[in-house]
From Swiss-Prot:
Hydrolase that can specifically remove 'Lys-48'-linked conjugated ubiquitin from proteins. Has exodeubiquitinase activity and has a preference for long polyubiquitin chains. May play a regulatory role at the level of protein turnover. It catalyses: Thiol-dependent hydrolysis of ester, thioester, amide, peptide and isopeptide bonds formed by the C-terminal Gly of ubiquitin (a 76-residue protein attached to proteins as an intracellular targeting signal). Residues 388-427 are annotated as: Ubiquitin-binding domain (UBD). Keywords: Hydrolase, Phosphoprotein, Protease, Thiol protease, Ubl conjugation pathway. The record marks D413, L416, A417, L420 as: Ubiquitin-binding. Residues 68-80 have a biased composition (Pro residues). It comes from Mus musculus (Mouse). The gene is Mindy1. This is Ubiquitin carboxyl-terminal hydrolase MINDY-1. Belongs to the MINDY deubiquitinase family. FAM63 subfamily.
Length: 468
């Protein structure tokens, strides 16, 4: 009767060893090896009696990389039977994949921080926010207007700022707005607009969906995002207009928005009506020829629509810029972080659709102190390239004078052009004397609409004296 008592513990030990080993084998080779023979179990049990430490450690080492992937099975009863060593291994292994996502978390603050550039603006030291890449330009464009209007102020030593801080300042501005109308209905409508604006406020950090209409510089399809501009009293402009001198394009585009026009082009292409097919081709040609999303007609209408010294947001090519009008000319705020240390580069002129522009300081004086790294846009300090930039600028002013009605507006354009030209040559006289000075026939020369290539050739032959 003593043998059954000694033999009974052996099967119990074999069964526990079988359970542990079957679980480890199940993790390695699947459920096919789950059933075991009794003889094999006895052999395993004997092995478990001889080397109990080796029975538990090797399976934990073999399953080290497989211990974390099946955490869903941890609720099953055999899970806790693995002992303490698998728990230690699981803690070590599970901590490894948690360390991997930390690298993008370290990079996120770099994208979330924006450098603050301090400029003299109307006699007061004022901050503007710059961006290094395609950041949240709608948020920066709006906030820069609020900074230039002194509605939001920063500590004098502020050098960097986060998008969360900007959103907080903007939210406070929206909540501080009071309705001008006292009627109950208008107040409820105003409160609804504020609620809508606060809802879409986080979208400013990623981008806004706006849909332009080609009928006017301030025509956009209404979206909840537009309520932010309305509440803050910030005009939103674009310059993508159809030339009224092209009746075919006017008929093809009509009063449609951009999205509606794209749908129309697709529909007309598959139409059996030849007139619709032709109209679709005309509309498609309009989009292709105006891919810069700014036309000369739109530029003229934009100049006429903006008021003097008005701060607004200009939308073009999915980018939002801070814009102002000074002495009848349009300027865009330079927010490129590459110009962070360039104190004389604050504004960029907007006088043509080709992207040629010249930089100005905070007082809208032509800038000549650009760094070498910015030679692609500003001339890089080369006198010949700077003369070419100034010449293009003066030609654009005369073109604008030709398209606008004769009057005080045209005269102010000429006066500003002559002033800029005089400042340019006065600064160059300190380096080299100007041999010849001739009266500038601005009323005739610049209105001929010369191509860009001819203007470049002309600037090379007349590097000392530029005639328009």
């Amino acid at each position: 009767m003593e043998q059954p008592q000694t033999e009974n513990p052996a099967p119990s030990k074999a069964t526990s060893a079988e359970t542990v080993e079957s679980e480890n084998h199940e993790a390695l080779s699947g459920p096919e090896k789950h059933p075991q023979d009794k003889d094999g179990a006895d052999a395993d049990g004997a092995a478990g009696e001889q080397e109990p430490g080796d029975q538990t450690l090797p399976p934990a080492q073999d399953g080290e990389n497989l211990e974390c992937p099946p955490p869903e099975a941890s609720s099953s009863p055999p899970g806790p039977a693995c002992g303490t060593s698998p728990k230690v291994e699981t803690a070590e292994v599970c901590s490894r994949p948690q360390e991997l996502p930390q690298s993008p978390r370290i990079q996120q603050p770099e994208l979330d921080f924006y450098c603050v550039k301090w400029i003299p603006w109307k006699g007061e030291r004022t901050p503007i926010i710059t961006q290094s890449t395609n950041g949240p330009c709608p948020l920066l464009a709006i906030m820069n207007i609020l900074f230039l209007q002194w509605k939001v102020k920063l500590p004098p030593q502020k050098e960097v700022i986060t998008s969360d801080e900007l959103l907080t300042h903007l939210g406070n501005c929206l909540l501080s707005i009071k309705p001008q109308e006292k009627s109950e209905g208008l107040q409820l409508n105003f409160q609804q607009n504020v609620d809508d604006a606060m809802t879409v406020l986080p979208k400013l950090a990623t981008g806004l969906d706006v849909n332009v209409r080609f009928t006017g510089v301030s025509d956009f399809e209404y979206t909840p995002e537009c309520s932010i501009f309305d509440l803050l009293g910030i005009p939103l402009y674009h310059g993508w207009l159809v030339d009224p001198q092209s009746p075919e394009a006017v008929s093809a585009v009509g009063k449609l928005s951009y999205n509606q026009l794209v749908e129309k082009i697709i529909t007309c292409k598959h139409s059996s009506d030849s007139n619709l097919v032709t109209e679709g081709l005309v509309a498609e040609q309009f989009l292709e020829t105006t891919a810069a999303q700014l036309t000369y007609h739109g530029l003229c209408e934009l100049t006429a629509a903006a008021t003097e010294d008005e701060l607004s947001v200009f939308f073009r090519n999915n980018h939002f810029s801070t814009m102002t009008k000074h002495k009848s000319h349009l300027y865009l705020l330079v927010t490129d972080q590459g110009f962070l240390q360039e104190e004389q580069v604050v504004w960029e002129s907007l006088h043509n659709v080709d992207g040629d522009s010249c930089f100005c300081d905070s007082d809208f004086h032509l800038s000549h102190s650009l760094g070498k790294s910015h030679g692609a846009e500003g001339g890089g300090g080369s006198p010949e390239k700077q003369l070419q930039v100034d010449q293009d600028y003066l030609i654009a002013l005369s073109l604008q004078q030709q398209q606008q009605p004769q009057g005080t507006l045209g005269l102010s354009d000429l006066e500003l052009a002559q002033q800029l030209q005089q400042e340019e040559y006065q600064q160059q006289q300190a380096v080299q004397p100007v041999r010849t000075r001739a009266p500038s026939p601005q009323g005739r020369g610049a209105t001929s609409g010369r191509p860009a290539g001819e203007r470049r050739q002309r600037s090379k032959t007349e590097s000392d004296c530029v005639l328009l």
